[in-house]
């Protein structure tokens, strides 16, 4: 789409959801005051670019201030889920292994006789990694390799 269409789309989105615009603006203002953004778990992301005299660097800093609290919180949550899944697999004496984390995805090598148990462990670990006011929804797929699982 053109820049104009994208701009119109964003403008309409914020008109429809004005509280989101307010939230984003407050995240940027808070980061400008403190020099960092915070995740829901109070993990700091320094943003020195917000103090730059260079417009492009400052704009980058503002985008970081908008995205870091949300993306950083998601990263914190997936790490907590990984710990829960790893601990449950270890405690249960499973041969299956947590291999890889890609953004909000966990890749688990699972033995055929453990598939159903491991699915339950993953579901519990991811859905209950943290208590929020909204449920954490997950998708789970399986295959003989990563490609098949997608």
Regions found by a protein language model. Name each.
Residues 16-18, 124-132:
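A common structural junction motif
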Residues 130-141:
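Conserved short beta-strand edge segments in small beta-sheet-based binding/regulatory domains
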Residues 1-94, 100-101, 111, 141-150:
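Conserved catalytic core of nucleic-acid polymerases
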Residues 1-5, 106-121:
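Catalytic palm subdomain of template-directed nucleic-acid polymerases
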Residues 23-24, 123-125:
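Glycine-rich, charged/polar anion/phosphate-binding loops
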Residues 99-103, 135:
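Short Gly/Ser/Thr- and Asp/Glu-enriched loop/turn motifs at secondary-structure junctions
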């Amino acid at each position: 789409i053109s820049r104009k269409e994208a701009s119109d789309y964003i403008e309409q989105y914020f008109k429809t959801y004005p509280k989101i615009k307010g939230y984003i603006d407050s995240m940027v203002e808070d980061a400008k005051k403190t020099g960092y953004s915070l995740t829901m778990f109070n993990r700091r992301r320094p943003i020195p670019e917000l103090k730059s005299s260079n417009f492009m660097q400052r704009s980058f800093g503002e985008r970081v201030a908008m995205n870091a609290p949300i993306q950083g919180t998601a990263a914190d949550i997936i790490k907590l889920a990984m710990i829960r899944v790893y601990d449950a697999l270890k405690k249960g004496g499973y041969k299956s292994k947590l291999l890889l984390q890609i953004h909000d995805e966990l890749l688990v090598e699972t033995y055929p006789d453990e598939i159903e148990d491991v699915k339950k462990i993953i579901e519990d670990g991811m859905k209950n990694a943290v208590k929020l006011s909204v449920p954490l929804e997950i998708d789970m797929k399986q295959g003989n390799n990563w490609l098949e699982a997608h």
